Amino acid sequence: MAVAKILLVDDEVPFVDTMIKRLTKRNMEVLPAYSGDESLKKLAENKGVEVVILDVKMPGMDGIETLKAIKKAFPLVEVIMLTGHATVESAIEGMKLGAFDYLMKPSDIDLLVEKVTEAAAKKQRHEEKIIEAQMQKITTRGR
């Protein structure tokens, strides 16, 4: 069983291909998307995605716009921003918008795997709390 199901969003095909190989070797299930729009479609089609690894600099819908859209439509999905063009301002903006973390390219694969694992665990904890709250409501109504 995979450690985490990831959606990797980057417009650079060679980078995506390399990362899929590296993450798959570490027992991650990875789906590729090459634009912000495609990432939203893939998230809608693949309900089990736990973590999105999202490039900041992309043509069309950039990473910050994509992050906003993901958090609006899929609030429990954790997003790790990954970029080679980071500024302090963009990192702060990403974190304010709900990014789990903000890493530089090229990222150490072990660090990235650690962050993905932490993000997936956070998503699972949030889902468990929601289920617990729903069960509490059902139990309370039944009394």
Task: Tell me what each language-model feature is.
Residues V13-P32:
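Two-component/phosphorelay signaling modules centered on CheY-like receiver
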Residues K41, I64-L76:
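Short amphipathic alpha-helix used as the core "switch/output" element in two-component signaling
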